[in-house]
Amino acid sequence: FSGDNIFNHNKQRLSYAGAFVYFPGAFYGVGYNAGAEGYAQELTTTMGIFRISYCTALAGRFYIGVSGGIDYTGAKYKDTGMVAYMNNVKADVDAGKPVPGGRMGELYTLWQEGRYDPAKQDPFSNYITESGDNPNAFNTSLGLFAQYDTRDVTFNASRGIFIKAEAKWYPEWLGNTRRNFGRFTLTFDFYRKLWKGAIFAYDLYADFTAGTPSWHMYAKMGGMERMRGYYEGRYRDKRLVETQIELRQKIYRRHGVVAWIGGGQVWGTDKFRWDNTLYSFGCGYRFEFKNRMNIRLDYGLGVYANQNLPWDRKRSSAFLFTASEAF
């Protein structure tokens, strides 16, 4: 659920959102290198979130406000036991038995060639062991933010600017699973009409963490809004910057199309390097089911992943279907 309440001729705003979901997921590790290597451990995740914020206008379209949030993520997982399995296969092969067929045989051959590491097959188990983090993590935040908003429509703008800077604090005394950590996010969106039915949209987003967050609270790349085409959280770290441009064109009555291109970086665990920049591009279809409210179908593409791993040789891609624009 989510909602926005506007009071006193748009001088005060109250926003809230929440969700509770149970879904299968995957964890690749923390840092660019972990995401690029492509070793993923399957998780069964229970997630509950609640967000609330209130802001008041200081002058014109400039607002300041306070925010709060609750995040819970619990993960169930099993080790694959690939290290022991590969060692057993090696012992059998050394004793004169044939290499197994199928996927396991291919992985054994890759291991012998130095292109597969069974010790990295369980990145979530490895992370929990090495970091001491809790797989069932609870986090509560308090925040302050400032924003400037001249958009004509908040959920599907055709002109205007939106800027928001927010600092959140996750104190241990509020029950956080990890010790104190902080988070700063910056959003800059720009919209402009071009020709008949065409809108140019630009988005810049930055997410920086101070301290060590819980495993599910790192800045995550991908998903429904930014860097579309990537599995959300495959690339995660303490610092993230993403940017994208999108052209939106209405073609006939309620029907429209879009195309976008974007790029992003995660770093902190690994050093910032320009050649670690990831890109995203794609196109989509829009159907305006109500005035200025669209159903969105997007197809996003990203980089090719680890060509050594059988499950990771295709280009990163995703179909996305939801209501409202990406930004």
Listing of model-derived features with the role each one plays in the protein:
Residues 1-5, 50-56, 66-70, 144-148, ...:
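Residues on the lipid-exposed face of transmembrane beta-strands in outer-membrane beta-barrel proteins
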Residues 227-231, 272, 276, 310:
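Outer-membrane beta-barrel domain signature, especially the mid-to-C-terminal portions
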Residues 126, 132, 139-147, 151-252, ...:
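C-terminal outer-membrane beta-barrel translocator/porin domains of Gram-negative envelope proteins
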